[in-house]
C-alpha cells in the first residue's frame, strides 16, 4: 500500500496574507510530497510494509521514521490551519487550557516561546498527556509526540521551509501570524478523542 500526498484542506491562497500560496506550493507540493515519495521508496521489503502511518511513526527509526513522521506531522499541521481560524477555543478545550496554563493568553505566550525557541528545524506542540493533562512540547527534526505516548492537539511547523518565503529569518513573526489561522475546531476534536 503506497502512501499518497493528501490534498490541502483549502485552496493554496486561502491562508493569505498570513501564509502565501507560494509558500504552500513549495511546502506542500514539494517538501511534503518528497517525504511521501521517500517513505514509499524506503518501505518495500521491510517490517513496515502494510502498516499504517501512525504505526510506522510509533515503531520505526532512522530514515523510515524521519520520512513517516514528516508525512504525519505535515498532514496534521495543514489541518491545524484554517482560513476561518484564529480567535480562541471554547468549551472543554478552553477550560483545559485555562486549567493548565492559567489563561488563554498565558498559553499563547508559552506556546509561542516553545515554538520560537525550538533549536533548528522542528515543531512546537500542544499535547494531551496520558492522564488527560495538557502540556507543551518541542521536537527537533521529524520528532513526533506519538512516540512518547502523548496525543498531539496542535502543532506549529518551525522548519525554515514553513516560513522563509514569507518571513525570511523572522520565525517570531511567522508564529505570530500562525495564531490568525489556528483551526480550533480541529484542535477540539483532537482533545475530545
From Swiss-Prot:
Fe cation binds at residues 27, 74, 157, 161. It catalyses: 2 superoxide + 2 H(+) = H2O2 + O2. Gene3D superfamilies: Fe,Mn superoxide dismutase (SOD) domain, Iron/manganese superoxide dismutase, C-terminal domain. Its EC number is 1.15.1.1. PANTHER family: SUPEROXIDE DISMUTASE, SUPEROXIDE DISMUTASE [FE] 2, CHLOROPLASTIC. Binds 1 Fe cation per subunit. It holds the Pfam family Sod_Fe_N. GO terms for molecular function: metal ion binding; superoxide dismutase activity. Homodimer. It is an enzyme of class 1 (oxidoreductase). Its cofactor is Fe cation. NCBIfam families: PRK10543.1 (NF007832). Belongs to the iron/manganese superoxide dismutase family. Destroys superoxide anion radicals which are normally produced within the cells and which are toxic to biological systems. Partially complements double sodA-sodB deletions in E.coli. InterPro entries: Mn/Fe_SOD, Mn/Fe_SOD_BS, Mn/Fe_SOD_C, Mn/Fe_SOD_N, Mn/Fe_SOD_N_sf, SOD_C_sf. This is Superoxide dismutase [Fe]. Induction: By growth in a high-phosphate succinate medium (at protein level). Strongly induced by growth on medium containing FeSO(4) (at protein level).
